[in-house]
C-alpha cells in the first residue's frame, strides 16, 4: 500500500508566557530561573526578580526565554543610561547597579576557579577605572541597504549580523563619541557606499585615529571630505583597502604612554580598550611579579610590549615571545625607541611545544603570560620546565584561566593571589590576574 508524506507536527511550547522567579545569574550575565526543574535562561533579568517570560528555545536540558514583563524588580536594578540598551550587542548589564556588577564578577571568578582548579582564595581588591566614557577603541559596522538606500552605521546587535544604528555611545571616550554623527553624515554621501566595510576608531595619546576599511575604490572627492573631517578634529586618518594594507592619509602616527614608556602602534594592532584599567593592571603585574635586578623574565604573548617594557626597567633581562610576527618586530622597535637594551623578542607558535626553541634553552626566574581568550593550553604544561619560581597569569577569560590553573597546580605551583580587572564595565566580560609561586 502506498504511503503518503505526512508533515511532522510542530512542537508546541509549554506556554506562550510563563511567570517565573529568577534565582541567580550565569557566567554570561543571563538570569537563571527554573521551569519544571529545567534551567531557563533569560537575558536582562536579575536574581530575586519575578518576571513573565516567553519561551524562545526549549531543549531537553535547558530553555531560553525573552523578558516580557517585570513583575517584581530587584534592588540592584537601575535604569540603563543608553537608549540603545537591549538592542546594541555591546553592553549587556546596564540594568544592574555597578557595585552589584563588581560583586557578581568576583563571585563568577571565584566559582570558576573553585570548579576547575579546586582553589579557594581571598580575592584582592578589584582593579577599576571609569564606569562610563572608558572605551578608547571601537569598530563601527557599515552596510549599504539597497532597499532603503540608506547607510547603516553602528554596532552589531546581540548574536546578530544586523546593525543597530547609533550616533552616540556613552561608553566611548568623548573624543571618539563626538565623531560618530559627523562620520555617519559624510559616509552616507559617498558615491560608492557599497564599498564601505567598517570604521575603526582609536583614541591615541596624540589624538583620535580614524581608519576606514573599504572593499572597492573610493572617489578622491569623498576621501577629501573625510580628510577634512579628520583634520578639523586633529585626528589621524588611515585607509585600509585590504585587511593587511594601511595607508596613512593625514595626521601623526599614533602612540600611547604607559607608565613612562612611549608605545607607538598602528590602528590594526591590539591595544587594551580601557586605558586607566590597563595602566593599573601593568602596575599590579609589576608588584606581583616583583622583578629584581638579577631576574631573567619571560613575557609570553607579549604583543607590542605592554608588560615587557616596564619589566625591563627593573629586571636583568626580558625575553618577549609572541605568535604574530608583525607584533614581534614592533615590540623590538618600541624597546629601542625607549632606550631599552636588555629586552629581546621572538616569534613562536605558542599553541605548541616550545621547549626546543633557542630562547627557551636558558632558565627564567619569573614568567608573565597574557594569552587570548583561548588561554595557554598549548604551553601551560611546559612552564615548570623553564624553572620559574613565580608566574603571573593575566587572563581575559576566567574559564580558561581556571583550566590552566589546574595544570600549574599539578606542576607544584601554589595560587597565592587572585584579582578581578574590570576592563569592560556594564558588560558580563571580566579580566583577571593570578599569581602562582613555588
From Swiss-Prot:
It catalyses: uridine(1939) in 23S rRNA + S-adenosyl-L-methionine = 5-methyluridine(1939) in 23S rRNA + S-adenosyl-L-homocysteine + H(+). The active site is at 396 (nucleophile). Keywords: 4Fe-4S, Iron, Iron-sulfur, Metal-binding, Methyltransferase, rRNA processing, S-adenosyl-L-methionine, Transferase. GO terms for biological process: rRNA base methylation. [4Fe-4S] cluster binds at residues 82, 88, 91, 169. PROSITE patterns: SAM_MT_RNA_M5U (PS51687), TRAM (PS50926), TRMA_1 (PS01230), TRMA_2 (PS01231). InterPro entries: 23S_rRNA_MeTrfase_RlmD, MeTrfase_TrmA_AS, MeTrfase_TrmA_CS, NA-bd_OB-fold, SAM-dependent_MTases_sf, TRAM_dom, U5_MeTrfase_fam. S-adenosyl-L-methionine binds at residues 272, 301, 306, 322, 349, 370. Belongs to the class I-like SAM-binding methyltransferase superfamily. RNA M5U methyltransferase family. RlmD subfamily. Catalyzes the formation of 5-methyl-uridine at position 1939 (m5U1939) in 23S rRNA. This is 23S rRNA (uracil(1939)-C(5))-methyltransferase RlmD.
Amino acid at each position: 500500500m502506498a504511503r503518503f508524506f505526512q508533515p511532522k507536527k510542530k512542537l508546541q511550547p509549554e506556554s506562550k508566557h510563563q511567570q517565573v522567579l529568577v534565582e541567580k545569574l550565569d557566567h554570561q550575565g543571563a538570569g537563571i530561573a527554573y521551569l519544571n526543574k529545567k534551567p531557563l535562561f533569560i537575558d536582562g533579568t536579575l536574581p530575586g526578580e519575578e518576571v513573565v517570560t516567553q519561551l524562545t528555545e526549549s531543549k531537553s536540558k535547558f530553555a531560553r526565554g525573552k523578558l516580557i514583563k517585570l513583575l517584581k524588580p530587584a534592588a540592584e536594578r537601575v535604569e540603563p543610561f543608553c537608549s540603545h540598551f537591549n538592542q546594541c550587542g555591546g553592553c549587556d548589564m546596564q540594568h544592574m547597579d555597578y557595585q552589584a556588577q563588581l560583586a557578581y564578577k568576583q563571585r563568577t571568578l571565584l566559582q570558576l576557579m573553585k570548579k576547575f582548579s579546586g582553589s579557594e582564595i581571598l580575592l584582592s581588591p578589584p582593579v577599576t577605572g571609569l564606569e562610563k566614557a572608558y572605551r578608547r577603541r571601537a569598530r563601527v559596522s557599515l552596510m549599504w541597504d539597497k532597499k532603503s538606500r540608506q547607510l547603516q552605521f553602528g554596532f552589531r546587535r546581540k548574536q546578530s549580523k544586523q546593525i543597530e544604528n547609533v550616533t552616540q555611545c556613552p561608553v566611548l571616550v568623548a573624543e571618539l563619541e563626538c565623531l560618530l554623527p559627523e562620520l555617519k553624515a559624510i559616509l552616507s554621501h559617498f558615491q560608492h557606499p557599497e564599498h564601505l566595510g567598517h570604521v575603526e576608531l582609536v583614541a591615541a595619546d596624540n589624538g583620535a585615529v580614524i581608519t576606514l576599511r573599504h572593499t572597492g575604490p573610493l572617489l578622491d572627492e569623498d576621501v577629501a571630505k573625510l580628510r577634512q573631517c579628520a583634520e578639523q578634529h586633529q585626528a589621524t586618518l588611515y585607509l585600509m583597502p585590504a585587511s593587511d594594507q594601511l595607508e596613512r592619509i593625514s595626521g601623526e602616527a599614533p602612540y600611547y604612554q604607559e607608565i613612562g614608556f612611549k608605545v607607538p602602534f598602528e590602528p590594526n594592532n591590539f591595544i587594551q580598550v580601557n586605558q586607566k584599567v590597563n595602566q593599573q593592571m601593568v602596575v599590579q603585574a609589576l608588584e606581583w611579579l616583583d622583578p629584581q635586578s638579577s631576574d631573567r623574565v619571560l613575557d609570553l604573548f607579549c604583543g607590542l610590549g605592554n608588560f615587557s617594557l616596564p619589566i625591563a626597567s627593573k629586571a636583568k633581562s626580558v625575553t618577549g615571545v609572541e605568535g604574530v610576527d608583525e607584533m614581534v618586530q614592533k615590540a623590538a622597535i618600541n624597546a629601542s625607541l625607549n632606550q631599552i637594551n636588555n629586552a629581546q623578542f621572538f616569534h613562536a607558535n605558542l599553541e605548541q611545544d616550545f621547549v626546543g626553541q633557542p630562547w627557551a634553552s636558558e632558565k627564567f626566574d619569573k614568567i608573565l603570560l597574557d594569552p587570548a581568550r583561548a588561554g595557554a593550553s598549548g604551553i601551560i604544561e611546559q612552564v615548570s620546565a623553564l624553572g620559574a619560581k613565580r608566574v603571573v597569569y593575566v587572563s581575559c577569560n576566567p574559564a580558561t584561566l581556571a583550566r590552566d590553573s589546574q595544570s600549574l597546580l599539578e606542576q607544584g605551583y601554589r595560587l597565592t593571589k587572585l584579582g578581578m580587572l574590570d576592563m569592560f564595565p556594564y558588560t558580563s566580560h571580566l579580566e583577571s590576574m593570578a599569581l602562582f609561586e613555588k
